[in-house]
Amino acid sequence: MLKRVTQVEPGTVRRLVDLYRESMDQLARHFESPQAMEQAYEEFLTEFVTHHRQMVLVEEVDGEWVSALRCVESAPGVWFLEALETAPQARGKGWAKQLMKHTQQLLTGQGAGELFSLVSPRNTPSIATHVSCGFVATDRQPINGWGEEEPGMILYAWQSEGTPCT
């Protein structure tokens, strides 16, 4: 079931940190302690979810958050998806694909014409998920939703019916 995180309540940060454990472990070296990292993440999330055109979406199964992503409307009807990740213990069960499909339905219901994501060419599971959801690799410059170039990444795009991917 798709859930939108609309406020950072007790337990929200812990649930997301647990889900994003591998990414968080990589980020930890940039902070003086795991607690400092979690505090910074809580501050980021608290600000992020207050914006109408920014969302944290999670796929929940039997009360457990199994997959999550963030999305940002970078231009009217154009949404940037990032931080798609599935909890290690939930991988290989199709939860990321289900989350992507639910996200496509939610955002097209709000008038989205294009969704895009930047994917490392080495991240074959993410590429497979994106392709299975109708995203295609483009030749477009790998610019994220905030207008920052991310060299080495591939921009994958999905468009609603009648809007060709370029």
Give the predicted meaning of each segment.
Residues L118-V119, V131, V136-M153:
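Conserved catalytic-core motifs of GNAT/GCN5-like acyltransferases
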Residues M1-D18:
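A short beta-loop-alpha structural element at the N-terminal edge
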Residues L107-V119:
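Conserved GNAT acetyl-CoA-binding A-motif
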